[in-house]
């Protein structure tokens, strides 16, 4: 959990200003359609105002700018004066308040929209801003979530206020392609735009932040039933692309429509040939969705009190908790391979890792003095006042406790993997409990290691900083897995290779075995491995 008090003033106002060369490029594309009215919903100190001047200001253009902070609004106004912008209006205040009034009247006002909307998490917005953000979704009849970010309603309302055939060019977070809270935005863009192009850099454009950013170029449909060309993603390195006419880049980028526009956009980074190969593989009758062959459930929940409920052997011994201590794992350091057995459990204990989950299922009055002392220690630390703890009785008895033969870590760095839970250890809320419904545990664990599952995980998952991929149960259920009965898997060898950091070798090896059995060539297997690697690299850039 991140708290507002811990955030910098820059993060709280979302103030990451666009480099001038990028603003010039985006503005050139919007201006090339000769707009008469332009919206800048969050102008900051006027970088995009300067970009209009740098591209040759047309005195007939009416410029409507909004800025929440008075010091920045003053700077933007000064830029207008220096560049002799006679038709520019700088409004100090919340853009969303004004936008919602216009949306209420169903007005389409602008020929173009520019900018870099604020990057502020919903939880850090003031209450009135939160209300205005939610109102944008309601006006557009879109699903709202409190996991959203300020840039999403800014982009939505700007697009809604754009006239048919209008252009919008903005610098926004790279998470637009994949985060669940932007799904309503992706769907809306796909519905109202004739074409969408994302320029995705390999570098971080904003200093002092790990926030990846992209350029969004989108053209609104001339009429509602116009066919959409979909979304296309262009990967760029450095700033050489700025030498190219943005219209050429936009026109030459192939869009992929249909499911790509409606779902996550990561798929748009793939070529037509790559998409066709993936579709051909998943069309095979032995390639099935995970939800059709297994069940996945979240691990037991401790309400963030992991340091209390998950303990090392020393704590168990000190408070005589042996009767209530059960084996557990929940992080990659607990299980670096695909097998969690007694040997791995002992290794973890010897390292001093918290390998014991405390399930105290007796009433307090019947417990020994030492166990009571441990519970009192938890109350001194006020664990019993935490929401999930205080609503259960007794507070120290964790609900939903059971183990399965298969586990899966919530987050991974290289590729997702299932874990054969041979000691039936419990898992934390950082891991999932998995049960096979159609095949053996060993076959499911080993079959999960293949390039098509890696690819669909990269397409479905959520990217985080530091090169981390996260999958939630609803996304895991969508993964494709190749299930063939009768294959001989050397699970012990695979486990050792993965522990040795050779997971790509395992993916290639397992893909060769399973895909070969299904009639696919070694060349096709290698191509799928390459696709998985390229998606991992793309995801890593987005993650950092």
From Swiss-Prot:
Reaction(s) the record says it catalyses: a 2'-deoxyadenosine in DNA + S-adenosyl-L-methionine = an N(6)-methyl-2'-deoxyadenosine in DNA + S-adenosyl-L-homocysteine + H(+)
MF terms (GO), sorted A to Z: DNA binding; N-methyltransferase activity; site-specific DNA-methyltransferase (adenine-specific) activity
InterPro entries listed in its UniProt record: DNA_methylase_A-5 (IPR003356), DNA_methylase_N6_adenine_CS (IPR002052), M_Eco57I_C (IPR054520), N4_N6_ade-DNA_methylase (IPR050953), SAM-dependent_MTases_sf (IPR029063)
Activity control, per UniProt: Stimulated by Ca(2+) and Mg(2+).
Annotated TM spans: none
PANTHER family: DNA METHYLASE (MODIFICATION METHYLASE) (METHYLTRANSFERASE)-RELATED (PTHR33841:SF5), DNA METHYLTRANSFERASE YEEA-RELATED (PTHR33841)
Family: Belongs to the N(4)/N(6)-methyltransferase family.
Record protein name field: Type II methyltransferase M.Eco57I
Lineage summary: Bacteria, Pseudomonadati, Pseudomonadota, Gammaproteobacteria, Enterobacterales
